[in-house]
């Protein structure tokens, strides 16, 4: 995963002028009423259609373009399909908001033109901004017949903060109810206080992106800039936790794979 490298390259690039401008990802075409030549076949961007199903902060899609049927090799169709998505939606939108992708050779009955599908992505961008007041998503899962409460800060992808390449897992043991959830309000308040203290310690050198609570443990997922002293500051905060075992484990994870299972 080279998103961090691309961001550093972009930040070091010269300012844009009348001729040249730099970008760290492929931007969408300004005009979809154009054709591209792919493997000797002319492909009309505007003929791309999408059948979509929105989840919480992701959209699963089936993508169709008549040009797919010009190729017998499915791997060529897949490469062309991803190119069309980058050309029509932009690489940023594809990576942040698209979940499962299927490239199909027949136009689905309820598919919409790609130009209309962009409205769905605009809605997601507004609902889950990358700066300012950000919106947490909450879900519940069952593990060994015990509930796990999950909170995530979409989008859980590298492009949300590409310079934060180190995953830090912080696990707290707490007084648990028989369900595995925090026993009482006092325990909840203690967990909230240590979360706030960690957020203050991390400051602008990282962020908490997901929290899992259940089975007597709260697991917080941070992504941080390891070139700072942020991990040392976090350890100083954790030394104050006196309600159970606590564990901090950093790992280099530029692709944010450690939280990929929490995208929903």
What are these regions (language model features)?
Residues 2-195, 203-209, 214, 225-232, ...:
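Charge-rich, low-complexity segments
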Residues 218-222:
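Short beta-strand->loop micro-motif that forms the acidic, two-metal-ion catalytic signature
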Residues 238-247:
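A common structural junction motif
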Residues 254:
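Glycan-association/targeting regions that enable binding to alpha-glucans and other polysaccharides
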């Amino acid at each position: 995963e080279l998103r961090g490298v691309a961001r550093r390259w972009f930040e070091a690039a010269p300012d844009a002028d009348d001729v040249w401008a730099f970008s760290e990802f492929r931007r969408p075409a300004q005009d979809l009423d154009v054709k591209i030549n792919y493997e000797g076949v002319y492909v009309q961007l505007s003929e791309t259609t999408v059948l979509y199903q929105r989840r919480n902060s992701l959209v699963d899609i089936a993508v169709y373009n008549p040009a797919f049927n010009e190729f017998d090799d499915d791997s060529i169709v897949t490469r062309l399909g991803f190119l069309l998505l980058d050309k029509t939606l932009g690489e940023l939108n594809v990576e942040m908001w698209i979940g499962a992708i299927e490239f199909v050779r027949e136009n689905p009955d309820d598919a919409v033109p790609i130009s209309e599908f962009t409205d769905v992505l605009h809605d997601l961008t507004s609902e889950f901004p990358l700066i300012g007041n950000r919106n947490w998503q909450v879900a519940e899962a069952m593990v060994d017949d015990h509930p796990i409460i999950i909170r995530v800060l979409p989008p859980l992808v590298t492009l949300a903060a590409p310079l934060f390449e180190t995953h830090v897992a912080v696990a707290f043991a707490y007084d648990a109810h028989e369900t595995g959830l925090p026993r009482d309000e006092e325990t909840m308040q203690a967990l909230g206080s240590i979360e706030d203290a960690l957020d203050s310690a991390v400051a602008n050198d990282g962020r908490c992106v997901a929290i899992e609570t259940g089975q007597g443990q709260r697991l917080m997922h941070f992504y941080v800039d390891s070139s700072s002293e942020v991990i040392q500051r976090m350890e100083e905060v954790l030394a104050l936790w006196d309600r159970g075992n606590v564990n901090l484990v950093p790992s280099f994870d530029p692709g944010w794979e450690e939280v990929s299972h929490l995208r929903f």
